[in-house]
Curated annotation (Swiss-Prot):
Predominantly expressed in roots. It holds the Pfam family DOG1. Keywords: Activator, Coiled coil, Disulfide bond, DNA-binding, Nucleus, Transcription, Transcription regulation. Disulfide bonds join 256-262. GO terms for molecular function: DNA-binding transcription factor activity; transcription cis-regulatory region binding. Binds DNA as a dimer. Interaction with the Dof domain proteins OBP1, OBP2 or OBP3 enhances the binding to the ocs element. Interacts with RAP2-3/EPB, an ethylene-responsive element binding protein. The reduced form interacts with NPR1. Residues 106-120 are annotated as: Leucine-zipper. Residues 149-359 form the DOG1 domain. This is Transcription factor TGA4. Residues 79-127, 257-277 form a coiled coil. Transcriptional activator that binds specifically to the DNA sequence 5'-TGACG-3'. Recognizes ocs elements like the as-1 motif of the cauliflower mosaic virus 35S promoter. Binding to the as-1-like cis elements mediate auxin- and salicylic acid-inducible transcription. May be involved in the induction of the systemic acquired resistance (SAR) via its interaction with NPR1. Could also bind to the Hex-motif (5'-TGACGTGG-3') another cis-acting element found in plant histone promoters.
């Protein structure tokens, strides 16, 4: 029995939209092996020229497809199409991920740009312009600011806007006729708003505790009264006490006891801060002069600075507890007046900062 060797055409990569090219190669292979058994299903009709048919199919020209073409098209193309669809879906997924990352990068850049504009406005207000130049030391702080701190400043700006809205709402309600249930809802919302600020500060302190401690996110007049990144609870109670009238004897006693407890807690935190400053100074100053390398001192100082975040959180916890205790001592209407007075107090400090900055820019 004579065995004719079959010459296989090397496979060639073809696309879904090139079905006839591969079929042409298969036909050429069968044509070159004429002594090979050929099934009747793929016999080329006698009235067609094999050479011209092969040439037409290899160039993708239209013709009457024979049964083999139909079988190959139906049996081979679905797998190719499914693979191509899967590749397209994967490419689309990666494209969406790249687009999402790009949008996030744009948003971060936008936040940084807004913050730089705010810092520039703040520099103008605080008189950092000298002639036609800018004090770059005052603004160098912005260059190294992390995206987390930029996001905090944006959040704090929205927080102040919401506080102003709540103040207007409380003022309107207290001058009108409203039920205690509606008033209680406004008081609870205002309390939650302050608690939200404490959570925001706690997250920001983990990123840059010096930024929170310095109060750079507040106006200059607010920074003048700053105590461990915020207001001093005992002093604030002293300012707000006249707005609580009329108070019962028991309420007055409770408020005085609360203020005394706040003073004791504030003294303990202040003493802890002084001790931390003392130990931090010793850590930085340790070592011999002229060593050139400060790595051991910096490592020790960094470990001690971790306690600074705890001080900020404890101070905010004291503010949180003071507000809650005042809410417990006062009636709903008294608490609403107290929150209104507290909000207006901060509004007046911000207005004082703006007025002082405007006075500095006036010609003498």
């Amino acid at each position: 029995m004579n065995t004719t060797s079959t010459h296989f055409v090397p496979p060639r990569r073809f696309e879904v939209y090139e079905p006839l090219n591969q079929i042409g190669m298969w036909e050429e292979s069968f044509k070159n092996n004429g002594d090979m058994y050929t099934p009747g299903s793929i016999i080329i009709p006698t009235n067609e020229k094999p050479d011209s048919l092969s040439e037409d199919t290899s160039h993708g020209t239209e013709g009457t497809p024979h049964k083999f073409d139909q079988e190959a098209s139906t049996s081979r193309h679905p797998d190719k199409i499914q693979r191509r669809l899967a590749q397209n879906r994967e490419a689309a997924r990666k494209s969406r991920l790249r687009k999402k990352a790009y949008v996030q990068q744009l948003e971060t850049s936008r936040l940084k740009l807004i913050h730089l504009e705010q810092e520039l406005d703040r520099a103008r207000q605080q008189g950092f312009y000298v002639g036609n130049g800018v004090d770059t030391n005052a603004l160098s702080f912005s260059d190294n600011m992390s995206s987390g701190i930029v996001a905090f400043e944006m959040e704090y700006g929205h927080w102040v806007e919401e506080q102003n809205r709540q103040i207007c709402e409380l003022r309107t309600v207290l001058h009108g006729q409203v039920s205690d249930i509606e008033l209680r809802s406004l008081v609870e919302n205002a309390m939650k708003h302050y608690f939200q600020l404490f959570r925001m500060k706690s997250a920001a302190a983990k990123i840059d505790v010096f930024y929170v401690m310095s109060g750079m996110w507040k106006t200059s007049a607010e920074r003048f009264f700053l105590w461990i990144g915020g207001f001093r609870p005992s002093e604030l109670l002293k300012v707000l006490l006249p707005h609580f009238d009329p108070l019962t004897d028991q309420q007055l006693l409770d408020v005085c006891n609360l203020r005394q407890s706040c003073q004791q807690a504030e003294d303990a935190l202040s003493q802890g801060m002084e001790k931390l400053q003392h130990t931090l100074a010793e850590s930085v100053a340790a070592g011999k002069l002229g060593e050139g390398s400060y790595i051991p001192q910096m490592t020790c100082a960094m470990e001690r600075l971790e306690a600074l975040v705890s001080f900020v959180n404890q101070a905010d916890h004291l503010r949180h507890e003071t507000l809650q205790q005042m809410h417990r001592i006062l009636t709903t209407r008294q608490a609403a007046r107290g929150l209104l007075a507290l909000g207006e107090y901060f509004q007046r400090l911000r207005a004082l900062s703006s007025s002082w900055a405007a006075r500095q820019r006036e010609p003498t």
